Amino acid sequence: MPHHYILTLFGLLPVATNISTWWNFGSMLLTCLMLQVLTGFFLAVHYTANINLAFSSIIHITRDVPYGWLMQNLHAIGASMFFICIYIHIARGLYYGSHLNKETWMSGITLLITLIATAFFGYVLPGGQMSFRAATGITNLLTAVPYLGATMTTWLWGGFAINDPTLTRFFALHFILPFAIISLSSLHIILLHEEGSSNPLGTNPDIDKIPFHPYHSYKDLLLLTLMLLTLMITVSFFPDIFNDPDNFSKANPLVTPQHIKPEWYFLFAYGILRSIPNKLGGALALVMSIMILLTAPLTHTAHLRPMTFRPLSQLMFWTLISTFITITWAATKPVEPPYIIISQTTATLYFTFFISTPILGWIENKMMNSC
């Protein structure tokens, strides 16, 4: 056991004995964050935030910089791994009732919003065709804001179109926001351990606890090893698996792709945006697709904390997961039948989960009371 008092406190942290592998994703997210900051720093050393040179600087990093290809692929695929872990982390929180720890949940959603902003700014930086179009399309949504929209968009772009000032400020934001994420993560962990984590049964964990180290630390280490192994296999053998073919071409404002397709981890929100044939309505739906997670602690009406013994909520939860996957897939397709109706149906089902949660809680309470 380490002798430094902070490390000793961390090692002796009391944790419920019955938390499963689903509780490992917090430490995996911390590892992803460290990896992103390290690889991002080495990429920033060689990157040029200039509209004419950005694409060339990425090629230079990949071809000429020693292990530049590794840094670039680790950073790009590491971002996908980050989002896989965070989506599983959120799903686990919804399933096992972790959202009832309100302060921790709210800080977590703030973290998610900051992470999405950071990833979006990073996606624009390579200066590829799809990066340019995604930046133009998404930032242009600000014009839907009444009265202030056009001014806000011009201010964000630093001009009347995406150009050098846009890339410079996006690079600055992409560089600084990870430090905000680190600070928010510290706050998230402090708030979590003030009350303690939940467990699969939703019972009071104070009855039976064990030290975090060595029991849970070694359990975390197993999944961490598997995650890093998966990451290295993907980087080594399938480095372009998440890349869009259009992004291998330098940004050309005179050429428009068939349809805008952001990175896969934005597609569920983009699919919801695209399913509404109105600019302001779509922009509001896009924001609500994330912000509606904040309502989860307020709409929990069931007597039981987790969904472990709540069959109706389980059915709705797995509908949400399948909806999330379907809307992600539909958002990769052109805006034409049948993808339009699929997007609209799945967008409706996505919001239905959060609206139906309190009703299902009341029904399940009645069912339990009648037994």
From Swiss-Prot:
Binds 2 heme b groups non-covalently. A ubiquinone binds at H193. InterPro entries: Cyt_b/b6_C, Cyt_b/b6_C_sf, Cyt_b/b6_N, Cytb/b6-like_sf, Cytochrome_b, Cytochrome_b_C_euk/bac, Cytochrome_b_N_euk/bac, Di-haem_cyt_TM. It is found in: Mitochondrion inner membrane. Heme b b562 binds at H75, H174. The keyword Zinc does not apply. Keywords: Electron transport, Heme, Iron, Membrane, Metal-binding, Mitochondrion, Mitochondrion inner membrane, Respiratory chain, Transmembrane, Transmembrane helix, Transport, Ubiquinone. One of its GO terms (cellular component) is mitochondrial inner membrane. Heme b b566 binds at H89, H188. Its cofactor is heme b. The chain crosses the membrane at residues 25-45, 69-90, 105-125, 170-190, 218-238, 280-300, 312-332, 339-358. The keyword Iron applies. GO terms for molecular function: metal ion binding; ubiquinol-cytochrome-c reductase activity. It is a multi-pass membrane protein. Pfam families: Cytochrom_B_C (PF00032), Cytochrome_B (PF00033). GO terms for biological process: mitochondrial electron transport, ubiquinol to cytochrome c. Belongs to the cytochrome b family. The cytochrome bc1 complex contains 3 respiratory subunits (MT-CYB, CYC1 and UQCRFS1), 2 core proteins (UQCRC1 and UQCRC2) and probably 6 low-molecular weight proteins. Component of the ubiquinol-cytochrome c reductase complex (complex III or cytochrome b-c1 complex) that is part of the mitochondrial respiratory chain. The b-c1 complex mediates electron transfer from ubiquinol to cytochrome c. Contributes to the generation of a proton gradient across the mitochondrial membrane that is then used for ATP synthesis. Heme 1 (or BL or b562) is low-potential and absorbs at about 562 nm, and heme 2 (or BH or b566) is high-potential and absorbs at about 566 nm. This is Cytochrome b. It comes from Python regius.
